[in-house]
UniProtKB/Swiss-Prot annotation:
Annotated Low complexity bias: 997-1016
Record carries keyword Nucleotide-binding: yes
PTM entry text: Phosphorylation of the TEDS site (Ser-357) is required for the polarization of the actin cytoskeleton. Phosphorylation probably activates the myosin-I ATPase activity.
Family (UniProt): Belongs to the TRAFAC class myosin-kinesin ATPase superfamily. Myosin family.
Record lineage: Eukaryota, Fungi, Dikarya, Ascomycota, Saccharomycotina
Domain spans labelled TH1: 773-963
The name this protein goes by in its record: Myosin-3
Length: 1252
């Protein structure tokens, strides 16, 4: 048993000392789920767009949305809440590296924060993907993790963290909107920097805004919405705002109702409006500032309700002047100036350096509507920029905030039916991000291989620099430069500017990534070809508010409006003002420069479908994204040299269990260099050297299958350790069961109850063949009993009970045993298969054995109703074959080979007397319907000595005992003889281990047998009488003609001979006087005892010496004896209680260990334990010195015949009863020997690997 082994081993040497303080102890992750697909695309066996898509789809269908490509995270939008952003989930990623937890956005955040603290380098995460793929959600989760993970020790730090988190709902309200593809689409780009102090606590922040889609303010396509804030404000505005600003429901405003979508499923605008107000308060916006913000929003909504009619001259006029009156009230300007600005345009002419004339040109309805929308867009754009700047002021950096983590959340790549200036700007920025992604990824890989001195082959990839130059270049001019030239040529006329731009596009026709079509042009982006409309594109690029509107807003008495429009028109400046294209190019290049200064992380988001369904995975849609995101190229780059790499410490921490030299009982014990530990692990795991390379600080593994093999071996380590503990525990339980059975047998023997209760069944077995079949030697032994349930199926926690459960057997088992069944194969061949045969009161079960996943499974092959058995066919020779002939069964008749066939047949005939037993030289049975097969039998000297041989339909067997042979009589020996010495040896072992002096104690009132049973079930709960010093049990020497008295020996006799007579041990007590004959006990180990007992048993079996000792004169009835111990008795009236020192007469000694005694006055008589009394010679005698005489007396009473005086027997030779008794003793000894050897073999097998 494993527990004993560890105790023994600890005597020889202590366990290795734990080493490697940096290496964490390995632990079994019970929460680990079964891997779906691969968690890292670099581990795919085949690299293709289709295999990547299949892996992502498989994980998406199982609710797993995150996958790695090395350190790049792939995120598939689930369109539902998966419950994976809880506080417990966050805690599970804290302090763990990428391989220690499943892919997750929290793992990216943890890696950035760890690198910030460890290497003191700025970090950034680039989140890319198309609209609706989940970029904004990923950014929010990163901010959530960093705020929760970074420690907080002051109120100011906590306030900054709250303010950083509050920017999310605020900027989402003003910068996000519902589109056809996404309910919360970012219509602007932002780069949020969270800055940290020297203690790596967030102490400041800064937001950079990129290109707000202001066109959405004045118009949206059907089923899309304006920015969220308009619907939140119109639905959730308090009564105060409704009175001051005239706020109505969104259906009352053209800007919020024209697209016929004012509500979004699963979005509560009123609740989100309250969150927006809370975010404003958290950031520090005052009540006055909030009022001014909502006043401007109300002005925008009412501006949208200004409508025009055509007058008689064909010019525009205000349809309802009450609307313009209210707008003038909100903007705090004069109504007349507002109306003029909307329906007239001021035109100035110049003559050289002289001032020219000024004209007021009336506008038509289309032109007036454009001016109205331009005013609304300008107010909202400037309001949004003011909010961003106000947030940055609140997040003002404290001194020492020089390190940061940047989070880029920018609009994704867009392809619509009609694409204009906004789309080319958005797609240009994504091209720049794709360019920096490729450059930084390749650069990072190259730097890693160079630093680690690893050689690799560069991989080819598409460099989209040519597309970026096509859009942003100045010499030769790109698309934006051509657009600026067209505007400068025809500044006042938008149509003329569009035509001039179309002409300049002819310069790009030679570019392979450009195509010019009628009134349209195509740019072949990395994400796909996009067709842009030329009409109106130049006007959107101007980014200038008309002079009329600027002058109007400059007259306002509202300080907030003047604040958001600070710039005054420069009428005398001849320098061309920057266009929107110029601004976006400048912002994109600044962004690239900022990202290049930080250590980047990447999140690539994917949108699974266009219907926002949580169950649909559109393969073609995702395949397109996989291609334009370049995931296949990214995988190839990552795997160009090696599929997996890890620093030495983390590799050892993960796999040190695979090396016995590095681990002991789950602890890391290697005290050498970590590099040497890496080499040992790879060597002990049998990983070929061609599968890896070792760098300076990292181990590089070439193929994913190698990593899979390492992970599989690590997983099996825990399984093997659990299985080993289970085996040890089962052995321990089985030992207790065996001990209980031995004690029960001893109790039954002492009480006169026969251990063998199946004598009548055994005798019936002699008659079952009718004297026609030869018998085996083992079948005729007197010790042979029909025990029935040999597999202990009716017991609990046994293999038999496990088989019974597997076969779904619910009845009580009458017979169970292992055997074989002949299975007919195609072509006439046959195969012997191992089976288990179980007999119940109604059925015969044949259970097959099947091995699956290194575990044995038991499946029912046959369930035969006893009433369906017609006959049993056996041969007339001593073989073990029998055929069960069935009645009208579609299945073939079973042909069985079973050592206990006679017992099974006997039980079958008793349960169903109509079963006929056919004994013949052949066995006939049906192999199939109407397919009779005959098995012959014949003698053969080539057959095994104790078995038979089946060959080509013939049973070969040796000659057996005559058919009329009957079994020997049951041996008349007591079970206590067999097991008594074993229990005594156990007590001796315990006393040797303890080694402390104890005074003799009286036995408890319960009987000795009951005490022994208690000791078996509770080994530590019983204390037997012990002595201070013990003598080794003396050994009887081989019998000679002149008998020598037994002599005590200080050392156990190592002679290879042993007498057949039993030496009964008795409890020993401490003595007050030592004689010269007594010898001090030898401190012999338990192992020596077992070895000598085994040698003695082996010698006995070799010599087959069944001799009995010489007769010894019987003791007279008047012999006097003295009580050596107190014997209070168990309360049985047949016992005679004694106190130590009492003198008694002994008239009879029984082999069971009891003596019939009486007091000196013959007033009381009863049974006393023989081992508790010694021969009385008139002095106080040492009990130990008398025990040999008592044993001699018992031997004399046990054996009524001496081999030295055979003439005294009536029959020549030993009787059957005496021979059976001695043979039974030898068989019992052999059984104990085999059991001991089996246990030692099991222990020997686990000595090498018992490291748990």
């Amino acid at each position: 048993m494993a527990i004993i082994k560890r105790v023994v081993r600890s005597k020889a040497g202590q366990a290795p000392v734990k080493k490697g303080a940096k290496i964490k102890k390995a632990s079994y992750d019970s929460s680990r789920k079964k891997e779906v697909g691969v968690s890292d695309l670099t581990l795919l066996s085949k690299i293709s767009d289709e295999s990547i898509n299949d892996n992502l789809k498989k994980r998406f269908e199982h609710g797993i949305i995150y996958t790695y490509i090395g350190y790049v995270l792939i995120s598939v939008n689930p369109f539902r809440d998966l419950g994976i952003y809880t506080d417990d989930t966050m805690k599970s990623y804290q302090g763990k590296n990428r391989l220690e937890a499943p892919p997750h956005v929290f793992a990216i955040a943890e890696n950035m924060y760890y690198n910030l603290k460890s290497y003191n380098e700025n970090q950034c995460v680039i989140i890319s993907g198309e609209s609706g793929a989940g970029k904004t959600e990923a950014a929010k989760r990163i901010m959530q993790y960093i705020a929760a993970t970074s420690s907080t020790h002051s109120e100011s730090i906590s306030k900054i963290k709250d303010m950083v988190l509050a920017t999310n709902p605020l900027l989402e309200s003003f910068g996000c909107a519902k589109t056809l593809r996404n309910n919360n689409s970012s219509r602007h780009g932002k780069y949020l920097e969270i800055k940290f102090d020297a203690h790596f606590q967030p102490c400041a922040g800064h937001i950079t805004n990129y290109l707000l889609e202001k066109q959405r303010v004045v118009g949206q396509i059907k089923n899309e919405r304006n920015f969220h804030i308009f619907y939140q404000f119109t639905k959730g505005a308090p009564e105060e705002y409704r009175q001051l600003f005239g706020v109505q429901q969104p259906e009352q405003y053209i800007y919020t109702s024209a697209s016929q979508c004012t509500a979004v499923e699963n979005m509560d605008d009123v609740e989100e409006f309250n969150e927006t107000l809370n975010a404003m308060r958290t950031i520090g916006l005052t009540k006055s500032e909030q009022d001014q913000i909502f006043r401007a929003l109300a002005a925008i909504l009412w501006i949208g309700n200004i409508s025009f009619v055509e007058n008689e001259a064909g010019n525009a006029e205000i349809r309802d002047k009450s609307v313009t009156t209210f707008v003038a009230y909100l903007l705090e300007v004069q109504e007349e100036l507002l109306i003029k600005a909307l329906i007239e345009r001021i035109i100035e002419t110049t003559h050289g350096a002289k001032r020219g004339s000024t004209y007021h040109s009336p506008l038509n309805i289309i032109q007036a509507t454009a001016v109205r929308d331009a005013l609304a867009k300008a107010i909202y754009n400037n309001l949004f920029e003011w909010i961003v700047e106000r947030v940055n002021n609140s997040l003002q950096a404290f001194p020492g905030a020089d390190k940061s983590i940047g989070i880029l959340d920018i609009y994704g790549f867009e392809i619509f039916e009609h694409n204009s200036f906004e789309q080319i700007c958005i797609n240009y920025v994504n091209e720049k991000l794709q360019q920096i992604f490729i450059q930084l990824t390749l650069k990072s890989e190259q730097d890693t291989y160079k630093k680690e001195q690893i050689h690799w082959t560069p991989i080819e990839y598409f460099d989209n620099k040519i597309v970026c130059d096509l859009i942003e270049a100045k010499r030769p001019p790109g698309i934006f430069a051509a657009m600026n030239d067209a505007i400068a040529t025809a500044h006042a006329d938008s149509d003329a500017a569009d035509q001039a731009f179309a002409q300049r596009l002819n310069l790009f026709t030679t570019n392979p990534h450009f195509e010019l079509r009628q009134n349209k042009f195509v740019v072949k982006h990395y994400a796909g070809d996009v067709t842009y409309d030329i009409f109106g594109i130049t006007d959107k690029n101007k980014d200038q508010l008309q002079k009329d509107l600027v002058e109007l807003l400059s007259t306002t008495s509202n300080s907030f409006v003047r604040e958001i429009f600070p710039d005054q028109p420069q009428t005398d400046s001849r320098r061309r003002p920057p266009t929107s294209g110029d601004k976006i190019i400048k912002s994109a290049n600044e962004l690239v420069e900022t990202l290049s200064k930080a250590q980047p992380s990447y999140i690539r988001t994917i949108k699974p479908n266009d219907t926002k369904s949580s169950t649909i995975y559109d393969d073609q849609r995702v395949l397109h994204q996989i291609k334009y995101l370049g995931l296949k190229e990214n995988v190839r780059i990552r795997r160009a040299g090696f599929a997996h790499r890890q620093v030495f410490e983390k590799f050892v921490e993960r796999f040190y269990l695979l090396s016995p030299q590095c681990s002991y009982a789950g602890d890391y014990v290697w005290d050498g260099e970590t590099l040497d530990a890496v080499k040992l692990i790879l060597q002990d795991a049998s990983i070929p050297t061609t599968e890896y390379e070792i760098g300076v600080t990292q181990i590089f593994i070439k193929h994913p299958e190698t990593l899979f093999a390492l992970e599989n071996m690590r997983d099996k380590y825990w399984y093997n350790m659990a299985a080993r503990i289970q085996r040890a525990w089962r052995r321990y339980l089985q030992k207790r069961i065996d001990a209980a059975i031995r004690i029960q047998n001893a109790i039954r023997g002492k009480s006169g109850v026969s251990t063998f209760r199946n004598d009548e069944l055994r005798n019936a077995g002699d008659k079952v063949y009718g004297g026609k079949k030869e018998r085996r030697n083992m079948s005729l032994l007197g010790l042979r009993g029909f025990y029935g349930d040999y597999l202990s199926c009716n017991e609990s926690k046994t293999r038999g009970s496990y088989i019974k459960r597997q076969a779904n057997i619910t009845e009580r088992v009458l017979f169970s045993s292992h055997g074989n069944s002949l299975h007919a194969m195609y072509g006439g061949a046959s195969q012997r298969l191992r089976k288990t045969f179980i007999l119940t009161p109604t059925s015969l079960w044949i259970v097959g054995h099947t091995k699956a996943r290194n575990a044995m499974k038991y499946i029912t092959d046959y369930r035969i109703d006893l009433g369906k058995i017609r006959s049993i066919s056996v041969t007339n020779l001593q073989d073990d074959w029998m055929a069960v002939n069935l009645m009208d069964s579609p299945k073939p008749d079973p042909l069985i080979n079973l050592p206990f066939k006679t017992e099974l047949i006997t039980r079958l005939t008793q349960l169903n007397p109509r079963i006929h037993v056919k004994v013949s030289s052949t066995i006939e049975y049906l192999r199939g319907p109407k397919k009779l097969f005959v098995v012959k039998s014949q003698y053969s000297d080539s057959a095994p000595k104790y078995h038979d041989l089946y060959r080509n339909g013939t049973i070969l067997v040796r000659h057996g005992n005559p058919p009329d042979s009957t079994a020997e009589n049951r041996p008349a020996f007591n079970n206590e003889d067999m097991y008594g010495n074993l229990m005594e040896a156990k007590h001796k072992t315990m006393k040797k281990k303890v080694g402390t002096k104890r005074t003799p104690q009286a036995l408890p009132t319960s009987s000795l047998a009951a005490s022994a049973a208690q000791a078996a079930y509770h080994p530590k709960g019983i204390r037997s009488p012990t002595s201070t010093e013990q003598k080794s049990p003396s050994k009887s020497k081989p019998i000679t003609k002149t008998r020598k008295p037994p002599v005590s020996s200080p050392v156990r006799n190592t002679s290879k001979t042993i007498s057949n007579s039993k030496v009964y041990s008795a409890p020993k007590a401490s003595v007050t006087k030592r004689t010269q004959d007594t010898v001090s006990v030898s401190k012999t180990s338990v192992k020596d005892d077992v070895t000598q007992e085994k040698n003695a048993i082996i010698q006995t079996e070799e010599k087959q010496n069944y001799s009995l000792p010489e007769n010894i004169p019987q003791s007279s009835q008047t012999d006097s004896y003295q009580a050596a111990y107190d014997f209070p008795g168990s309360g049985n009236p047949s016992e005679l209680p004694l106190q130590k020192g009492d003198i008694i007469y002994v008239s009879k000694s029984d082999p069971s260990g009891w003596s019939l005694a009486s007091t000196l006055d013959n007033s009381k008589e009863g049974w006393v334990p023989t081992s508790y009394i010694v021969k009385y010679n008139g002095n106080v005698t040492d009990p130990s010195a008398q025990h040999q005489d008592m044993n001699t007396m018992k031997i004399q009473e046990d054996n009524t015949t001496s081999i030295n005086e055979p003439e005294t027997h009536t029959n020549q030779g030993p009787s059957n009863t005496d021979l059976g008794a001695n043979l039974a003793s030898v068989l019992a000894a052999r059984a104990n020997k085999l059991r001991s050897e089996s246990e030692e073999d099991i222990s020997r097998e686990e000595d090498d690997d018992d490291d748990w």
